[in-house]
Amino acid sequence: MIDYASSASLSRMLYGEDLIDWIIKNRPGITTERQSDGPVTFPSPLYPRTRNVLIVRAPMGSGKTTALMNWLQCILCNSNMSVLIVSCRRSFTNTLSEKINRAGMSGFCTYLSSSDYIMRGREFSRLLVQIESLHRVDSKLLDNYDIVILDEIMSTIGQLFSPTMKHLCQVDNILTSLLRYRPKIVAMDATINTQLIDMLAIMRGEENIHVIVGEYAASGFSRRSCTILRSLGTNILLSVMNEFKQLPSHTQPIFKQSTGVNGSLDISLHDRTFFSELTRRLEGGLNICLFSSTISFSEIVARFCLAYTDSVLVLNSTRNTPIDINSWSNYRVVIYTTVVTVGLSFNDSHFHSMFAYIKPTINGPEMVSVYQSLGRIRSLRLNEVLIYIDASGAGSEPVFTPMLLNHVIANGGGWPTRFSQVTNMLCHNFRRDCIPTFRAADALYIFPRFKYKHLFERCTLNNVSDSINILHALLESNLIHVRFDGCDLQLNAEAFCDFLVILRADSITAQRDMKTLRKNATCPLPVEVDVIDSDAVACFVQKYLRPTVLANDLTELLTKLAEPITREQFINITMLEACRATPAALYSEAVFCRIYDYYASGNIPIIGPSGTLDTTILTCDFNTSGRWDLYRVCCKWAELLGINPLEGPNADIDPTKLLHVMKDDYDIYARSVLEIARCYLIDAQTALKRPVRATKCALSGIQNSHHSQPSTQSHAVSLFKVTWEILFGLRLTKSTTTFPGRTKVKNLRKAEIEALLDGAGIDRTSCKTHKDLYTLLMKSKSLFRNMRYDIRRPKWYDLLRSRLDKELGIYHDLVDLESVLAEIPSALWPRVEGAVDFHRL
């Protein structure tokens, strides 16, 4: 892992800025070449002194893939050399295959054409394969490929961290062997960085590597200007959508609101918002491409655009529309999410302007994926991109503190020392805390070397300023000029922080406005969907749910399970309950792994946006050790705090007790949350320092006056609140009751009042009757005014199978686990006395 000192330069260095300077200083045996006068060109592969490992870092639109095709044609001319091309996406595989066929190169096929699981034989000697399927290539083929090509290598390596990577160890070992031993390697990407160069230098030797750094980008990028807007303008959205709904059906979808001159919206020229700018261009007859990082906004903005034209195409994961990029010129408006990414490029000069709505959230796409999707449109007639970054999904809690400073301001010496000292310290701490993560993968070669970059990209999504700074650095690396709306003069620290304050306030207001519209973003679910007759649903109910679940409740749950975040929370709470039902799982990793494999793998039914019953695959996390650590700590905390979420709402969590309970296990918990939830938590000692708090407020758009003085106790509450909502969907809220417990005070029994008085240390020896005890309790109200918290749970928790038999009032084992646990050899069960109930076994 390479250490970066400056929080202002970290994002640029992780994406390959100053690459040649680093190579000259640290790897002088590598030859380098700057190309700035035109599209990228490769050295001739036929030249005897050409080095066998070629690394190309160049912006999007610099001609990398064209140069690769020319290089391949040259080296394969009158040759039987074998070629393996490893890609990161199926769409990218298909696009490269089409380009190879158009270039007239014969003998190539894709992994999609294989009828057998294992690809073997001469027909696969020139193969295009997605990295997730690399283990399906026969070892004899892998050991004999002459050329290995990794276009978009950083994205390809990033797939090692994807939930779709089911065979991580095999794939990592195969890719390591290919990079180390195959005769010729070509690696290309717009964000190749020093980590990759350093790894390949160790594997192949500096004397065998040549690096090309392209500094040219096609005019479609180099002339492009990007403006980051500070307001979404939902007042215009609501105005148009409300009128649109009231129109007769025969007049839809074309609409002109006649509140202004010439039947157009009355928008002030000074009203520069996302929707005002979009409205002007739609009314002006311009063609628009629009990227959205969320599905819901893509549907909302599609309905907005339909008010002006019926020529609208929407591409997201909930629609079955095939991605035919050649048809885009038939539409005035094309709206897409990250389903359109590397490997797909629209080259026609059809669209005038690009708009982008980006919402950084812990479960959303990282900024590199956003950047890749923005680059799919190669030419814009007006060379303008307007971006709105929704800050409402980023964390404002003290456990999430921004780590990065904007590099443009830093280059001008504009960041005060009080900011840079704090963020540099946080970057150092983050690097330190990444080192012990993913211990289960330490034996691998590639995965551990890039875990820091992966965790950095995921964890920074909790902070809007970090996300903005990363995107800013990526866009500038592609020679795109970036400006901030309202900051027309030189961007400085004060203007940047003011921008964040306005952006966060606008985002919160905008989210309230869009809540009413989001319900209609997708097709409504038919009530008559018959899920009860499905065998798959019946098996699902038997495995996870109470047998008395009602059809309407089941339908609602299956609809929610179509969302990845709900599926993750569903498995987490199921595992928490299973571990508490089987205490041996808390002491034996083998027992835990068997239970986890049972609940976190296989197919489960879902109801998609179309309202039809479907299935999705659950994939176990390879990092079972990290999961084991996390669930053990959560089980311990739940036991000590009296949290039983499947048994009903839980009340009266005392923050003092919470702090005491969390103290001993904080380090293990923080590391586990970083590994499993990709969520980096700032410890209390760091978070409570005055400079850190000031930096947090300034770079998060939070005004100091609105927040009380924090403490270790409030930090513990914040940490628990944030992480348990992410992991389990449980919400921690301030209790509004006077006394602990959910029973109304007038309904308290004598024993319950005695317990309350004893818990508060109140002497009740003189009180014998219920009336006397009640009077004493009411006189002692002031002693119960300490802050307490309730835990609110999702409605679907009522459907899950629990250890508690409510009718009998007893706890019991989950019966369906008996056959699963019977497969575990007795030697793997814990030997600690008291850990196993031998009667149950």
Swiss-Prot record:
<dbReference type="InterPro" id="IPR003593">
    <property type="entry name" value="AAA+_ATPase"/>
</dbReference>
<comment type="similarity">
    <text>Belongs to the herpesviridae OriBP family.</text>
</comment>
<dbReference type="InterPro" id="IPR014001">
    <property type="entry name" value="Helicase_ATP-bd"/>
</dbReference>
<dbReference type="Pfam" id="PF02399">
    <property type="entry name" value="Herpes_ori_bp"/>
</dbReference>
<comment type="function">
    <text>Functions as a docking protein to recruit essential components of the viral replication machinery to viral DNA origins. In the presence of the major DNA-binding protein, opens dsDNA leading to a conformational change in the origin that facilitates DNA unwinding and subsequent replication.</text>
</comment>
<keyword id="KW-0547">Nucleotide-binding</keyword>
<dbReference type="InterPro" id="IPR003450">
    <property type="entry name" value="Replication_origin-bd"/>
</dbReference>
<dbReference type="GO" id="GO:0042025">
    <property type="term" value="C:host cell nucleus"/>
</dbReference>
<keyword id="KW-0235">DNA replication</keyword>
<comment type="subunit">
    <text>Homodimer. Interacts with the major DNA-binding protein. Interacts with the DNA helicase/primase complex-associated protein and the polymerase accessory protein.</text>
</comment>
<feature type="domain" description="Helicase ATP-binding">
    <location>
        <begin position="45"/>
        <end position="210"/>
    </location>
</feature>
<keyword id="KW-0067">ATP-binding</keyword>
<dbReference type="GO" id="GO:0003688">
    <property type="term" value="F:DNA replication origin binding"/>
</dbReference>
<dbReference type="InterPro" id="IPR027417">
    <property type="entry name" value="P-loop_NTPase"/>
</dbReference>
<protein>
    <recommendedName>
        <fullName>Replication origin-binding protein</fullName>
    </recommendedName>
</protein>
<dbReference type="GO" id="GO:0016887">
    <property type="term" value="F:ATP hydrolysis activity"/>
</dbReference>
<dbReference type="GO" id="GO:0005524">
    <property type="term" value="F:ATP binding"/>
</dbReference>
<keyword id="KW-1048">Host nucleus</keyword>
<dbReference type="GO" id="GO:0006260">
    <property type="term" value="P:DNA replication"/>
</dbReference>
<feature type="binding site">
    <location>
        <begin position="58"/>
        <end position="65"/>
    </location>
    <ligand>
        <name>ATP</name>
    </ligand>
</feature>
<keyword id="KW-0238">DNA-binding</keyword>
